[in-house]
């Protein structure tokens, strides 16, 4: 059986006074080690920082136009992704006294306005360039959707 993971994403804007380079410096030089250590301590399985510069957004917009797609291009500068087994992991991180120090560190770099949070589960079908977790009969993820999201199901337990 292939296990589904929860993914929390937090999409941030830089402060107007913070350059793209300074935002990257904050994330990689000032924040990454402390955040990664804290998240690993509490059971986070993966922690990613996703950077989106104006050049990347412009390139995506050009690609979108070439497809004739009606996409909205996300304008956030830094998105943090955490992959976890359950919501209790996030509660444990938030209750750790070290977590409170993150706000002070972020203050010169990240805006607290318009942070977009998303929580859902992940089903992976390509890893390392190879098709995974799928057969001719479909997805290998079990239980099926109804049982997974239903009352008493794995999702309910993970969110408890």
UniProtKB/Swiss-Prot annotation:
Induction trigger: Expression is positively controlled by the cluster-specific regulator ATEG_00326.
Disulfide cross-links: none
InterPro entries documented for this protein: EthD_dom
EC number: 1.-.-.-
Top-level lineage group: Eukaryota
Family: Belongs to the tpcK family.
Official protein name in the record: Putative oxygenase ATEG_00330
Source organism of the structure: Aspergillus terreus (strain NIH 2624 / FGSC A1156)
């Amino acid at each position: 059986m292939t296990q589904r993971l929860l993914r929390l994403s937090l999409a941030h804007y830089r402060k107007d006074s913070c350059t793209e380079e300074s935002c990257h410096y904050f994330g990689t030089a000032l924040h990454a080690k402390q955040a990664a250590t804290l998240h690993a301590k509490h059971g986070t399985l993966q922690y990613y920082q996703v950077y989106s510069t104006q050049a990347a957004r412009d390139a995506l917009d050009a690609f979108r136009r070439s497809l004739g797609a009606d996409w909205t291009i996300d304008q956030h500068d830094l998105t943090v992704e955490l992959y976890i087994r359950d919501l209790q992991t996030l509660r444990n991180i938030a209750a750790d006294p070290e977590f409170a120090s993150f706000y002070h560190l972020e203050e010169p770099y990240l805006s607290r306005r318009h942070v977009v949070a998303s929580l859902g589960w992940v089903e992976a079908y390509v890893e390392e360039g190879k098709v995974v977790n799928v057969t001719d009969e479909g997805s290998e993820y079990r239980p099926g959707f109804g049982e997974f999201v239903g009352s008493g199901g794995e999702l309910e337990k993970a969110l408890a």
